[in-house]
Amino acid sequence: MKKVLMAFIICLSLILSVLAAPPSGAKAESVHNPVVLVHGISGASYNFFAIKNYLISQGWQSNKLYAIDFYDKTGNNLNNGPQLASYVDRVLKETGAKKVDIVAHSMGGANTLYYIKYLGGGNKIQNVVTLGGANGLVSSTALPGTDPNQKILYTSIYSLNDQIVINSLSRLQGARNIQLYGIGHIGLLSNSQVNGYIKEGLNGGGLNTN
């Protein structure tokens, strides 16, 4: 009788364990912040097609990747800063997230820093990655933000072969600065090596020693 009871208990335990296990095709809930992709002068949201596809292949959810289209294509901070602020607020509301991460190309880097420095973005962003960013037009240092518990982490990626934005504008004091070679300004948007550094930056691999 004891053997029969023990066998029954073992069988019941196995059944319950199978029922409790998630389906083999189920994916774990994304732990990433929503990502806002910020284009530069004369750019558009489609500039980030390759980067979006790469991030999706690395586990980011497609519905958490947002690419802004600025009305003002000249990169004017006074116009693009407020639009970016409103856009981030909408993303936070839609996703329920507390913060976003930003990947910005060219003048989009300056627009992002302007938003952080002057328009309340300092407590709404966790990680910033700039690609050939014209960062120095707003700040030459990695702005810490306004969250007392967590500085904004920065990764600034730029190329010695960039003929549009000089490297000295892209470098941010206190950030993780990565100088590459053989990649043009537009090429930063579709380069596999750059993609790897973007992933690291979005996963908290940036720096802020300020």
Curated annotation (Swiss-Prot):
Active site (UniProt)? S106 (nucleophile), D162 (charge relay system), H185 (charge relay system)
Question: Could you tell me how activity relates to pH for this protein?
Answer: Optimum pH is 11-12.
From which residue to which does the signal peptide run?
Answer: 1-28
Where is the protein localized?
A: Secreted
Q: Which GO terms describe its cellular component?
A: extracellular region
Q: What is one process in the GO biological process aspect for this record?
A: lipid catabolic process
Query: In terms of temperature, how does the activity behave?
Result: Optimum temperature is 37 degrees Celsius. Stable up to 45 degrees Celsius.
The conditions that induce or repress this protein are given as:
Induced in rich but not minimal media with glucose as carbon source (at protein level). Induced by growth on n-hexadecane and tributyrin.
Broad class of the protein's primary localization: secreted
Keyword Transmembrane among record annotations: no
The impact of changing H185N is: Complete loss of enzymatic activity
The EC code for this enzyme is 3.1.1.3
Family annotation (Gene3D superfamilies): alpha/beta hydrolase (3.40.50.1820)
Q: Key word Lipid metabolism present in the record?
A: yes
Query: Which SUPFAM superfamilies has this protein been placed in?
Result: alpha/beta-Hydrolases
Its EC top class is: hydrolase
Query: Which Pfam family is one of those matched by this entry?
Result: Lipase_2
Give the catalytic activity. Answer: a triacylglycerol + H2O = a diacylglycerol + a fatty acid + H(+)
State the UniProt keywords alphabetically: Hydrolase, Lipid degradation, Lipid metabolism, Secreted, Signal
Which family does the record claim for this protein? Belongs to the AB hydrolase superfamily.
Protein purpose: An esterase which preferentially hydrolyzes triacylglyceride substrates with short chain fatty acids (C3-C10) with the maximum activity towards tricaprylin (C8:0); essentially inactive on C18:1 or C18:4 substrates. Active against p-nitrophenylesters with fatty acid chain lengths from C6 to C18.
Q: What is this protein called?
A: Extracellular esterase EstB
